[in-house]
């Protein structure tokens, strides 16, 4: 039972290790696999969206939390980590910051407070280590 496990680990680790190329003269990491589409239902994409939303709400000066309406598109690039470029639509909720865990947040119904945004997040991840970094975010009113 250990041989098949060992072989599968070898076949996974070696290509992953070869996927990254560091240019020592420029001290930069080159992408070995450029952005390609990935399913929005992928577990890593969902983790990255959750992380990006948490970071967005933490950094936002809005008095209300924003909720994910839908994930529109996701792409993946492999460098020294996995980089997910994710396009989402989010909306202001009825929950004020800081969140009380007993609240059930729903999108804002008050027309004066309603707000929808289209956002692009770039999340660097080593999901197997639980490491996530929000590399960039850009949001525009819808």
From Swiss-Prot:
SUPFAM superfamilies in alphabetical order: Cystatin/monellin (SSF54403)
Glycosylation sites: 100
Chain ranges for the short sequence motif Secondary area of contact as given in the UniProt record: 77-81
A cellular-component GO term for this protein: extracellular region
InterPro entries in UniProt: Cystatin_dom, Cystatin_sf, Sperm_Mat_Cystatin
PANTHER family assigned: CYSTATIN-8 (PTHR47010:SF1), CYSTATIN-8-RELATED (PTHR47010)
Full protein name: Cystatin-8
UniProt source species: Rattus norvegicus (Rat)
